[in-house]
Amino acid sequence: MKLSLSPPPYADAPVVVLISGLGGSGSYWLPQLAVLEQEYQVVCYDQRGTGNNPDTLAEDYSIAQMAAELHQALVAAGIERYAVVGHALGALVGMQLALDYPASVTVLVSVNGWLRINAHTRRCFQVREQLLHSGGAQAWVEAQPLFLYPADWMAARAPRLEAEDALALAHFQGKNNLLRRLNALKRADFSRHADRIRCPVQIICASDDLLVPTACSSELHAALPDSQKMVMRYGGHACNVTDPETFNALLLNGLASLLHHREAACKELL
């Protein structure tokens, strides 16, 4: 699997791996790259079955497989310890990495994530699936911004959204791959295993997220042994895109604090 690695800003700089949501594209994190690359070596990638990592996914494709193939690609690139920043589905992959490779994951940041899919989120995806089956890729792509962005943000950026729609349609991951990735997301359930995640976790959510209620982040916060929760008042599901200034400040402060916390804890053990 192809990865995109930025040059380390200094020797032995911490590594931060960015995992996008259902869309799977590493370019989702473009508003974060410049600020993160000043402090960290940053890894982005298109998830298997999307973008520059094309493949035909199996019907039983799972979050555990997503985590395993990413970890293997990181190890092949010489990266054995890393922090993870995951959005929605990417946050699920991050939790799976923290469970399966605890010696590798130093810190986890969950952005609009959850323990198991909420009834409201499931309903949203059911509507989107019906659009996909009845109207094809174009209907899926055109509806997607409604679940990602606040209405006023969209209204002020109509030409941008039209361009994004055209790009998303041109690089659509395919109906079968999309549904298999979506089914993996819907099957994932960390409610019985979250207490085994020992790395420090920063939880970021947006109070106006149409797709994932903030209660999901509250449940996640309550279930994790070592977590902190930050709520953005504005931004929608894709709050890192719509309000990058607020999001980036939270992310940078959180990473610095949690990595220091992890380093101090490791020294105490020594």
From Swiss-Prot:
It comes from Escherichia coli (strain SMS-3-5 / SECEC). It comes from the Bacteria. Coiled coil: none annotated. Keywords: Hydrolase. InterPro entries: AB_hydrolase_1, AB_hydrolase_fold, AB_hydrolase_sf, Pyrimidine_utilisation_RutD. SUPFAM superfamilies: alpha/beta-Hydrolases. One of its GO terms (molecular function) is hydrolase activity, acting on carbon-nitrogen (but not peptide) bonds, in linear amides. Its EC number is 3.5.1.-. One of its GO terms (biological process) is uracil catabolic process. Involved in pyrimidine catabolism. May facilitate the hydrolysis of carbamate, a reaction that can also occur spontaneously. GO terms for cellular component: membrane. This is Putative carbamate hydrolase RutD. It catalyses: carbamate + 2 H(+) = NH4(+) + CO2. The keyword Cytoplasm does not apply. Belongs to the AB hydrolase superfamily. Hydrolase RutD family. NCBIfam families: RutD (TIGR03611).
